[in-house]
Design a protein with these regions (language model features):
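Phosphate-group recognition and catalysis centered on beta-loop-alpha active-site segments
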Residues: 12-14
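Short Lys/Arg-rich basic patches
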Residues: 358, 377
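Acidic (Asp/Glu) and glycine-rich low-complexity loops/linkers
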Residues: 2-10, 19-144, 148-163, 167-183, ...
Length: 455
């Protein structure tokens, strides 16, 4: 009898143990840890937020301070939320100095934060972040991870740093002044900047800013990322040393523009530019449209080509590289050209004076309707000049030649000391020479042996 009782007790114990070791799906109808829950967590006052982890975060910058988490209970238990100083930190629970990683989850935790006094947000996680109703004198946003950020509101001073792969969608965030730094592959979208825009672009991420009404745009581009701007700005200060392009053809510049290119990146400027200063030292090309400048200066020291269009009162050009200047669409009053390299220069509609000195192999093509042509040719480069002019003064000591078969001058003083030659049509009287309807007159041919005329 005692033996039978012992066997019965042993069988019951074994059955209980088997049940205890069965999978949870058989032991109970639902795992409490996988159930979806919502937690309200207490927070003290804060003005900054630091986010890390794969959470979907929604921030209301006009709501009273609050913190709500929604997700599976096990996930919520592994989220640390703490206020340190003035900063609310939301991140995975740390394990021995490392963040605890959940692994793959079926649902993403949603974190809702009320932050009425919000001034700064730092995003280092992979989750997406929404920030609504931003308002105040200043706001700082740092995107350091793969998570995307979308923000809306209005602020006077906006400071943005993008060093991660996440995109920053800020086109619904109005700002007066914007200071933007791009060091990573993430893209940034802006809109409606009404003050100053300062861009430091060193990464591969692109910037697109629409609807600008800026007083001044300053851009420093050192990486492969592109910058595309539209709207208007009174002033532009651009420096490029990377391979990224500056797409400013849809940005109307109403004041001064400065552009320096030292790399392969291309640039396009447009508007009603009142003053222009450009330098092209790299292989990137420059296009400037809509010039309405009193003065314009251009220095070309590299292989990059330049195209200018519009109107300039006084144009000063130095060409020392292999890049060509195409100013066929530019109307100028006075033009000064110094050619020291293989790059060629094309000018049109010079209305007053053309002062050109050619020392290199680059050629000069120009059309005149003005007072004077002052030309010095010391190299192998040729010059072809058309139109009408009152006075021609030329000195040719190199192998290059002056082709003036299409040029009519009232008076010509040409000296040739080298193997080059010169030709120009000469008529009597400065007044007649300045007329576009006057006959060509006599063709003056000059070489180092002397000069003679033909009909």
């Amino acid at each position: 009898m005692k033996t039978a009782l012992k066997l019965t007790v042993l069988a019951a114990a074994l059955a209980a143990g088997a049940i205890a070791t069965m999978p949870a799906s058989f032991a109970q109808p639902q795992d409490v840890g996988n159930a979806v829950a919502t937690e309200q967590r207490a927070v003290t006052a804060f003005s900054a937020i630091e986010l890390a982890g794969p959470y979907h975060v929604v921030i209301d910058a006009q709501a009273k301070p609050s913190l709500e988490l929604s997700g599976e209970r096990k996930q919520l238990a592994e989220i640390e939320t703490v206020v340190r100083g003035d900063t609310l930190v939301v991140r995975p629970v740390q394990r021995n100095g490392f963040f605890f990683n959940f692994g793959k989850r079926r649902e993403t935790v949603t974190v809702r934060i009320g932050a009425a006094a919000l001034k700064r947000v730092t995003v280092a996680g992979s989750g997406d972040v929404e920030i609504d109703h931003i308002k105040g004198d200043s706001f700082t946003l740092a995107g350091n991870g793969p998570g995307d950020v979308r923000a809306s509101g209005a602020v006077r001073q906006l400071t943005v740093t993008s060093s991660g792969s996440g995109d920053l969608e800020l086109q619904h965030l109005k700002a007066g002044d914007v200071d933007l730094t791009l060091n990573g592959p993430g893209d940034v979208e802006l809109a409606d900047v009404s003050g100053t825009l300062v861009v430091q672009a060193g990464g591969s991420g692109d910037l697109e800013a629409d609807g600008l009404r800026a007083g001044k745009v300053t851009a420093r581009m050192r990486g492969p990322g592109n910058v595309k701007l539209s709207g208007s700005a009174r002033e532009l200060d651009l420096e490029m040393s990377g391979s990224g392009d500056f797409e400013g053809c849809d940005l109307r510049i109403d004041g001064g523009a400065r552009s320096v290119q030292r790399g392969p990146g291309n640039a396009c400027l447009a508007g009603a530019i009142r003053k222009f200063d450009g330098e092209v030292d790299g292989s990137g090309e420059l296009a400037v449209r809509g010039l309405q400048a009193g003065t314009a200066q251009l220095r070309m020291n590299g292989p990059g080509n330049v195209a200018l269009a519009g109107t300039v009162g006084d144009l000063n050009v130095e060409v020392a590289g292999s890049g060509d200047l195409d100013a066929a669409g530019l109307k100028t009053g006075k033009a000064t050209v110094r050619g020291r390299g293989p790059g060629g220069v094309t000018l049109a509609n010079v209305g007053d004076t053309l002062d050109a000195a050619l020392y290199g192999s680059g050629g000069l093509k120009a059309s005149l309707s003005g007072k004077r042509l002052l030309l010095r040719m010391n190299g192998p480069g040729d010059a072809r000049i058309d139109g009408t002019v009152a006075q021609v003064d030329a000195q040719i000591t190199g192998s290059g030649s002056l082709d003036g078969h299409g040029l009519t001058a009232g008076h010509a003083d040409i000296v040739v000391h080298g193997p080059g030659t010169a030709s120009v049509n000469v008529v009597d009287g400065n007044d007649r020479a300045a007329s576009k309807t006057v006959a060509r007159g006599q063709l003056l041919l000059v070489d180092r042996s002397g000069s003679h005329t033909t009909r």
